[in-house]
Amino acid sequence: MTDEATALIAQYWATGLFIIAVFALCALMIGAASLLGGRSRGPSKSLPFESGVVGTGSARQRFSVKFYLVAMLFVIFDIEAVFLFAWAVSVREVGWEGFAGAAVFIFILLAGLVYDSRVGALEWAPRKRGRSPDIVTQR
């Protein structure tokens, strides 16, 4: 073995031992659970049970795509907040170049937000087309 390999082994032996110990512990727990765990079968064992109520109907429900859209917009703007927080922490070190980069980043995200707003991605319910009925007053 070369000196580099020996130095590498000396540096990372604890990490390798930890990984081996984690896998051994997981195998031990799974094996003990399969040997010692109870095995009872019955019709009530296969029913889903949540909060003291036995479920009725199908567990598969159709969700609107709007939920997915809201989740994606949340993730996008949450990542924006993480990047801007990192910039805010190091604002003194990055100087005007960093400020310009953050300004471009914010501008691009604001342009995306305006686009989402214009195409209706932020509206939960569709807009009603046409005129609204006139208000009739009673006398």
Swiss-Prot record:
Statement: the UniProt record of this protein carries the keyword Metal-binding: no
Q: Does the keyword Thylakoid belong to this entry?
A: no
One GO location term (cellular component): plasma membrane
The principal localisation class reads membrane
Recorded topology in the membrane: Multi-pass membrane protein
Q: What class of enzyme is it?
A: translocase
InterPro entries hit by this protein: NAD(P)H_OxRDtase_bac/plastid, NADH_UbQ/plastoQ_OxRdtase_su3, NDAH_ubi_oxred_su3_sf
**Which catalysed reactions does the entry list for this protein?**
a quinone + NADH + 5 H(+)(in) = a quinol + NAD(+) + 4 H(+)(out)
Annotated Gene Ontology MF terms? NADH dehydrogenase (ubiquinone) activity; NADH:ubiquinone reductase (non-electrogenic) activity; quinone binding
Location(s), subcellular: Cell inner membrane
Q: Known EC number(s)?
A: 7.1.1.-
Q: Which Pfam families match?
A: Oxidored_q4
Q: Which family does it belong to?
A: Belongs to the complex I subunit 3 family.
Role played: NDH-1 shuttles electrons from NADH, via FMN and iron-sulfur (Fe-S) centers, to quinones in the respiratory chain. The immediate electron acceptor for the enzyme in this species is believed to be ubiquinone. Couples the redox reaction to proton translocation (for every two electrons transferred, four hydrogen ions are translocated across the cytoplasmic membrane), and thus conserves the redox energy in a proton gradient.
Name listed for the protein in its UniProt record: NADH-quinone oxidoreductase subunit A
What gene is behind this protein? nuoA
